[in-house]
Structure formats: C-alpha cells, structure tokens
Amino acid sequence: MTDPTKILIRLPNWLGDLMMATAFCRAVLERFPEATVDLIVRKGFEGLPLPHRGTLLPFDRELTKAGDFGAELANRGYQRIYVLPPSFSSAWMAWRSRIPERIGYSGDGRRWLLHPAIRPAWQPRTRHLVEEYLHLLSPQDSKTPLVFPQLELSEEWVSEQLRGLPALPKSFIALAPGAIYGPAKQWPEVYYHEVAAQLAQKSNESILILGTPADHASGEKIAQGLSGVENWCGRSNLPQLVALLSRAKLLLSNDSGSMHIMAALQRPQLAVFGSTSPTWTRPLNPHARFLYRAEPCSPCFDRTCQFSHTNCLISIQPADVVQELADMLE
C-alpha cells in the first residue's frame, strides 16, 4: 500500500486527552516524514504548539456541525484520517469527509462510518490511553512501541505568551487544584492549603495556584492567610497556562488537563489520583510521580463519588504529598 501524502488527525476534545494525543501526532510525523499532517482541534485549542506538519483546523463540538465540518473537508485531497475520539460524532465527521481511509476504533455504532474500524483486543481502560492511540498506527502489531507525549516550546513562544501577565517569581512551584471532570478527581482544598503552608514555610520557593476562572474560589481558599502563595486562577488563557507550567520548578495537581500539559512538557510533577486509574491516564513523563490509594470500588471513573466519601482521595494525606515533594525538591 502506498503511503499517504496528506493525512488528517481528528484530535480529542478533552485537554488531557489532547496532550496525550501529542504522542500519536509525533509518531505519525516520524512514520510519514514526507506527508502533510493537518490536525482537527476543538475550538480554543488552536493556539497550542501541537506537533503537526501543515494546518490546525478548529471546529465546534456540536454534533449538528460535525457533519457539515466533515463535508467541507471532502475536496482537500486527504487520503487518510485518524479518528482518535471514541464518539459517534467524530466518526460521523470523518464519514462526511469522504476521505478514503478513515481509521478509528469501533464502538458507539461507529463501525459503518470507519474504513477500517479497529476492534480493540483489550478490555476498556486496561492499557494506557497513549498506547490505545498509538495502536491505530499499527493495528496489526500486538505490541506498539511507546512514544511519550511532548510539546516542544521555543523560548520566543513562551516569552510571547507571558508578555501580558504579571512578572513571575524567579522560581516557583505550581499547584493546580482543579479538574473539570468532577469532584471525584479533586483532592480536598484543605489538603492543598496544608501542603502550600508547609511548602511556604520550609522552602524558599514562591507558590502559584493555577487554573481557570472556575477554580478561582478554590484558589482563594488554598492561599488564604499564606505568605508567598498567590492565586493566579483565571489570570491566564490556555497558551499562557502552558507557558507558565514550562517555567514552574514543579507541579502538584490532580489527574487533570494541567497534569497532562506538564507531562508533555517533561517537567517535574506529582499527581494525586482519585476516581480514575493511573493504568489508563498516569502522566507519561520520566520526571513524574503519582499517588493512588485504591479502594474496593476503585477505579470507578465517576465524576462524583456515589458513596459521598471520596476515600480514594482523602486517604492520601498532606503529609504523604509533602514527603514526595520534599524528595523531588532535594
């Protein structure tokens, strides 16, 4: 079979999944060094420095618009599209594009929309999501070579993103207490506050709390009464958040988009897991550590704890996190 010369990749909607998908983008670029590789990204993500060799195409998430968007791609000469999200709408978009090769996983009624549709040979969420993505590149192979997620940032790009923000401390630790998915992934604010207090007392590092406007109230509670701890939640847009994390000495976070950004930056990080599984979404980063306390109900993947106790999270004590951070800062 002749290698394609013009490839399209439909990337995931969730920020964390998008960051993990950078591994797949890198693998495609390496496998097809002469091909144009364009990316379909959720609107709002087009400002990110994602690995590609062509154009970033932003789209609206609505199902009714997915088909129209796909139809607009029909005359652009693509020979192959990789469909990474598992949703029906993403496969529908690919089908409407009339691209000859539409490669993605079956499920959710998608088989007839894809050509070929790949049937997973494993149970859901038992392999790392990065491995699931990479398997689409070589579905005939039982073992897929692992490629780590990676964002390559130029100093010029970082400086440009930071230009509109207040001056950064010379050195800082970042805390990212948010998780859009839901509270079953969010380590308690009071625990973050205690860790921030101990870090502020025992280290010479400034501490910045990073997140979206929705995380601002949480950031205020964490920073309350602490010297050297600043709440930056809501101050930055997404590219600026990437730039901020690239300058952080270390990140403490939940299993979240920020966690996966830091993993793609290959920077030191500690992640706290709750309802999700490290087997599926741990940060693939040689400088990463994570804490996970499995309960009999783990992993449930719920947004909200069905038992209203989130023991998987609260059993990870601030002292556990402080010890890990101390080891990493030595």
Language-model regions, residue ranges each:
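Catalytic machinery of carbohydrate-active enzymes
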Residues: M1-E330
